[in-house]
């Protein structure tokens, strides 16, 4: 597998010319890039440029705001805070259950600068989200913010450090990569860039499989033991992120909290919540409940895979894997029947698109489990492309939602304050 985080970094500081409609052409959305003529939100910025920009924009206290020192010890409060920052769902009082993952990341950040930069980025971007209500690139460019710029700078530094480490991957570099990948997924979720989030998921799951974070079977059904160094289990982390309750899809859900504009992993627009939402609210929770049940069973299955110590034990788990894949297949068929009247993925409720994303992630995780056969890569390319496609569709929907929201706000302001 090609560990190309260098490409991910380069795509954020390079502009691309294309003949499609800017700035939402499919070519650029799929690669996480920005059309030529549009400023990349992932530009590399220095501390001096951030300070100068803050002074020029008149942001109170931004120029003199001190950079918080790195942690020297880990407290329960630190763990709880990072666990909360892993997902925007926690802004709506949802419990995530990633305390151990948070502890592992924070412990690594004490000695690993790359992980430390990633944590710092997530913290800054999440704090900016909670204070401003939006961390979209357009919002940041219209209202420059030290927190946003600093978060982007730290993200670029983490990506650069990771690409350098993976030029000769050893156990420490692999652990760093998987921990950073967890944080990168959370960063892109905070920023609402679901196509790029999908890229990080694909990349991280690929590293897990290639370097055997869990035991597997070869073509001859011989056991291939797990990597000698215990690697972070990114698959379990991602499942927990998506399986956490989504208040937007629950019958008792209300509109976004205190008028905030953040889009969660299961967000539904205000229009979708008020127009024709009665049927959606009775259908989506049921579909989500079943998918969550499958994800819980998948987590249990992965625990069993990790403890496999013989080929015989591994082979006895294969029927369970097959049953889970069949459950996913049946779930998708049911979803298509429920939404048979929807002609295009771009017109279905966002909540449904996020369920599709979760379904595809579970499928990839299960396809990779206990499988290192020679034909696996061809199958994974197809499944990864599907995941990337779903992420890109969600990107388009979220960006369109933001534009519509901005336009409505502008009209509303003009009506209130006529020229």
Curated annotation (Swiss-Prot):
Any one cellular-component term (Gene Ontology): nucleus
DNA-binding region range list: 12-35
Primary location recorded for the protein, binned into one broad class: nucleus
Source superkingdom: Eukaryota
Name of the protein this chain belongs to: Transcription regulator lscL
Pfam families noted in UniProt: Zn_clus
Matches recorded under CDD domains: GAL4
Physiological role: Transcription factor that may coregulate the expression of the gene cluster that mediates the biosynthesis of the lipopeptide antibiotics leucinostatins that show extensive biological activities, including antimalarial, antiviral, antibacterial, antifungal, and antitumor activities, as well as phytotoxic.
Gene Ontology molecular-function annotations: DNA binding; DNA-binding transcription factor activity, RNA polymerase II-specific; zinc ion binding
């Amino acid at each position: 597998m090609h560990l190309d985080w260098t490409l991910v970094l380069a795509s954020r500081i390079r502009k691309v010319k294309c003949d499609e409609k800017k700035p939402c052409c499919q070519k650029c959305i799929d690669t996480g890039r920005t059309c030529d003529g549009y400023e990349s939100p992932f530009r590399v910025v220095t501390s001096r440029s951030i300070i100068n920009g803050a002074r020029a924009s008149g942001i109170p206290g931004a120029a003199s705001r001190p950079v918080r020192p790195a942690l020297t010890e880990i407290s329960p409060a630190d763990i709880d805070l990072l666990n909360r920052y892993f997902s925007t769902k926690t802004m709506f009082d949802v419990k995530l259950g990633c305390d151990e993952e948070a502890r592992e990341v924070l412990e690594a950040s004490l000695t690993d600068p790359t992980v430390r930069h990633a944590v710092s980025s997530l913290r800054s971007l999440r704090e900016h989200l909670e204070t401003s209500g939006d961390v979209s690139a357009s919002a940041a460019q219209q209202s420059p913010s030290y927190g946003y710029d600093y978060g982007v700078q730290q993200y670029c530094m983490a990506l650069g450090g990771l690409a350098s480490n993976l030029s000769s991957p050893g156990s420490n570099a692999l652990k760093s990569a998987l921990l950073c990948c967890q944080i990168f997924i959370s960063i892109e979720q905070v920023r609402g860039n679901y196509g790029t989030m999908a890229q990080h998921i694909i990349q991280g799951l690929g590293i897990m499989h290639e370097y055997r974070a869990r035991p597997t079977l070869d073509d001859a059904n011989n056991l291939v033991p797990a990597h000698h160094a215990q690697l972070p289990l990114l698959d379990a982390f991602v499942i927990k992120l998506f399986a956490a309750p989504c208040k937007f899809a629950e019958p008792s859900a209300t509109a976004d909290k205190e008028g905030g504009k953040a889009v969660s992993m299961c967000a539904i627009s205000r229009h979708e919540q008020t127009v024709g939402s009665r049927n959606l609210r009775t259908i989506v929770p049921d579909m989500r409940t079943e998918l969550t049940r499958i994800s819980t069973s998948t987590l249990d299955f992965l625990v069993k895979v990790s403890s496999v110590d013989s080929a015989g034990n591994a082979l006895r788990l294969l029927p369970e894997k097959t049953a889970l894949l069949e459950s996913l297949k049946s779930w998708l068929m049911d979803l298509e029947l429920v939404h048979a009247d929807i002609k295009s993925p771009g017109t279905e409720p966002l909540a449904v698109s996020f369920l599709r994303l979760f379904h595809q992630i579970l499928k990839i995780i299960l396809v990779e489990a206990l499988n290192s056969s020679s034909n696996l890569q061809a199958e994974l390319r197809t499944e990864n492309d599907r995941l990337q496609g779903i992420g890109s569709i969600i990107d388009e929907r979220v960006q369109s939602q933001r534009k519509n929201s901005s336009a409505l706000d502008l009209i509303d302001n003009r009506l209130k304050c006529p020229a």
